[in-house]
Amino acid sequence: MARSLKKGAFADESLLKKVDALNAANDKQVIKTWSRRSTIYPQFVGHTIAVHDGRKHVPVYVTEDMVGHKLGEFVATRTYRGHGKDEKKSR
């Protein structure tokens, strides 16, 4: 079920404060966050945000095309190792 339009998009308050502080200082630092559920706002564009994938922080450079999506969409949490090989085919 989608979020109500009257509520607006969600973004973690601490993440917004960090981005606004970097924008005010005109600084480009990597912002580390665990908030995969945060929506990407237009003021995030041009920043690199390190999003947690469950074991490490993966850097994501935010572009204009990402606005409106969630941070977690751009970092995979599971590694796909492929399906098992058939012993008969390998001989």
Swiss-Prot record:
It holds the Pfam family Ribosomal_S19. The keyword rRNA-binding applies. InterPro entries: Ribosomal_uS19, Ribosomal_uS19_bac-type, Ribosomal_uS19_CS, Ribosomal_uS19_SF. GO terms for molecular function: rRNA binding; structural constituent of ribosome. It comes from the Bacteria. GO terms for cellular component: cytoplasm; small ribosomal subunit. Keywords: Ribonucleoprotein, Ribosomal protein, RNA-binding, rRNA-binding. GO terms for biological process: ribosomal small subunit assembly; translation. Protein S19 forms a complex with S13 that binds strongly to the 16S ribosomal RNA. Belongs to the universal ribosomal protein uS19 family. PANTHER family: RIBOSOMAL PROTEIN S19P FAMILY MEMBER, SMALL RIBOSOMAL SUBUNIT PROTEIN US19M. This is Small ribosomal subunit protein uS19. It comes from Lachnospira eligens (strain ATCC 27750 / DSM 3376 / VPI C15-48 / C15-B4). The lineage of its organism: Bacteria, Bacillati, Bacillota, Clostridia, Lachnospirales.
